[in-house]
Every structure is written in structure tokens, then in C-alpha cells.
């Protein structure tokens, strides 16, 4: 992919956004951050408001926690986009946060004058630091090019389909991750109670069929019972809820989604949601023997809202069975 310097705004300099911003600066892009975050972004320049960012940038990357933060930001970004000199072209808002595909569709409807591309990332904080993220991009082919160009500095961006396709892909990714995290947590409790050396066991498992990036990442925390946060446990509920939205939209009765979401809700209700997701280990250990994780049969349909009709003058949002319209070098 041919890259050249662009003006990029980044909002959300947390565990993921901070190293990503560093890679964007290192790649030679003109990077803007909000003034209160400037101390986290060597080489970037400050702006006072999101509106100012949207009025100047080619791409604004949102790496905020979730949909409520994006709901609050988009009106200001829309104001900034409206102030742009027409000769400079429009700004693309790249949604790097993990949200429901339904949220992306709703924002597309509520802000028709904004160019939206969804670009959630996977690889965790370690992947962000290494610049080796898997980046799942959804949007119109004519609109994803600057996002693919910019995010190449942070990992491997791949255009998967129309607007919303990136969030569907990330939702599927997160179901698998959530299942692994909860399974690891529960298995670790059983193993320790049976007298096994957990460190030795997980090292052995890592070399077998159960081995995974998730296991490698969580093993030190599970062995040490260390729940210092790197990825908040409450995000499991948010992410699995997004997966259930995608499952509902495709007419899929989820087997794992409902129980995982309900387990995550109970963990949050127990006051553990702000700790690392490895805290599922503690939550499992503190529950009574034979206690069911769910009080009732979960709704397999999730919480999705109905998808609105397409607008002929806007990028086509993701819908079940939507075709892929990509150039060969984006595959």
C-alpha cells in the first residue's frame, strides 16, 4: 500500500490509542490530539476541541471506550466537517472503538453529512505497542482508502465490506476472546483446587491445541491472581452484547453469547467490572458449587435494533449477506 503523510486526528489516548498515536507520528503523519492529551503524544500537536480537529484533518480516529462517547463526539465533529474549505475535501471519521454494528448504522442515519468508516482493532495493548494490530475496516470502497493508508502504521488494516462490516468482524472476534477468557478463568480454578501447578499446566497447554494469544496474555495474571487492569472486565459485557446484535441481524440463535453476556453482567454487578478480565477467575472461585451462571434462559436474539433502510446517496451500511466490493490489493 502506498502511503504519504496525511493530517490525522486521534481522540481517545488510552491503552490502545496512545501507542497507535505514536506509530502515526513515527510514520510521518501530521497528528493532532486534544490539548488535555498532549502529554501522551510526543510529536503531535494540540487542538482545543473535536470540532477544530474535524475542520483540519483528513482522518479523525476515535479510540474512545464505546458508543456513549461517540454519541457525544459526533455532533461536534459534524460541526467541524461543515466548516471545511470545499477545496480540501471531506474528513473521514474512523471508528476504532468496539461498538454494535447497529450503532454504526444509527450514526450513519443521524449524521448523513459525515463520512463514517468503522475500523475496530484487535491485538490488545501489546499489539498496539508493537504496531501489529489486526484492523477490521468497513465502508464504501471510495471512502476507506485514507483510513487504510493511515492505519497501516499501526498494523494490518483489511477492508472487509460495507459500513458496519468491521464491527461485525470485531464482534465475532470478541465472542471468541470472551469465551476463551471465561473458560481459562474457570479451568484455572478447577485446576488449582485439584492441586495442580497452574503455571506448569498453562505452559503445557500453550503448546497444545488449547494454546492461544489469549492464553499467553492471561497466564501471568491467572497464575499470580493479578487483576490489575489492562482490559477491563466490563468490556466483555459490552463486546458480547455487540455480538448478539450481529447474531440477531443475521437470524442466528447464539449458543454462547447469552450465557457469556449474563455471566459478565453478574461479574459487573458484583463490583468487579473495573478490574482486568482475568478477574473472572475470582468471580468463578467465589460462586457456590453448582451455581448456574444464569438465572434464566438467555435471549439468543440479543439486543439489536432494526436496521433502517439504505440511503441511495450514502455509503451502503452492512446488512446480512452484503456483497464485498473491494479492489484486489485490499483483500
Segments the model singles out, each with a brief description of its role:
Residues 20-24, 107, 190:
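Hydrophobic residues within alpha-helices
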Residues 1-61, 125, 153, 158:
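NAD(P)+-binding Rossmann beta1-loop-alpha1 motif at the extreme N-terminus of oxidoreductases
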Residues 49-114:
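Rossmann-fold NAD(P) dinucleotide-binding segment
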Residues 135-137, 158, 163-194, 205-217, ...:
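Active-site-proximal catalytic alpha-helix in oxidoreductases
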Residues 163, 211, 217-277, 283:
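Interdomain hinge/lid region at the active-site interface
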Residues 271-331:
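NAD(P)-dependent dehydrogenase/reductase Rossmann-like domain
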Residues 96-174:
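Rossmann-fold dinucleotide-binding core
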